[in-house]
């Protein structure tokens, strides 16, 4: 797995093999950053369910100002910290080992926000369970309710095709959706409220 663009283009990243860890394929990351384009430049980024950090590190390579990574797996966090060091991006990053569902209790996370880009890339098995999908959709809405998403920010959510239920989101709406192989990527923004 390699970084696809920016100052660290071609840099090899360590990946883990697991049913719960699925780093986005390079072509998925290419699609994401082709759509985000200049949004990454200077962005404050939150990478939830970060795994080994390929999305956040790609954002940094393409000019993001700072990335806060969140993952609850000790194995993933070790690999992530190794990838950050290999890219020499320690000064632009912070890593929190915790569940993405518990971030709203973190003062540090709130103080570092709001975020221009939030990556939300949960394990597919979580979204395959009705309760898990409901928790994930609630998490996405709370990002807006808690003031973590910047006013013109984007949430980039990745899941298996046909899983996402956009109609259940109260605070976010889709700007664009792309399917790349067995992955569907949603670009979400705050819902526009009628005046």
Language model segments and positions:
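Class I S-adenosyl-L-methionine-dependent methyltransferase catalytic core
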Residues: 1-195
């Amino acid at each position: 797995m390699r970084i696809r663009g920016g100052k660290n283009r071609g840099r090899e990243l360590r990946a883990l093999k697991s049913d719960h860890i699925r780093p986005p394929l390079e072509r998925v990351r290419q699609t994401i950053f082709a759509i985000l384009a200049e949004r990454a430049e200077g962005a404050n980024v939150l990478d939830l369910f970060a795994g080994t950090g390929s999305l956040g590190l790609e954002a940094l390579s393409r000019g993001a100002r700072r990335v806060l990574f969140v993952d609850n797996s000790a194995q993933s966090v070790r690999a992530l910290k190794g990838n950050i060091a290999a890219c020499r991006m320690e000064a632009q990053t912070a890593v929190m080992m915790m569940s993405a569902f518990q971030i709203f209790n973190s003062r540090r996370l709130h103080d570092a926000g709001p975020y221009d880009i939030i990556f939300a890339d949960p394990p597919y098995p979580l979204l395959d369970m009705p309760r898990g999908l409901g928790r994930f959709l609630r998490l996405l809405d709370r990002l807006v309710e808690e003031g973590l998403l910047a006013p013109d920010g984007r949430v980039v959510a990745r899941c298996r095709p046909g899983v996402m239920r956009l109609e259940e989101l109260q605070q976010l709406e889709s700007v664009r959706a792309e399917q790349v192989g067995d992955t569907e990527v949603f670009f979400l923004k705050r819902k526009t409220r009628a005046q």
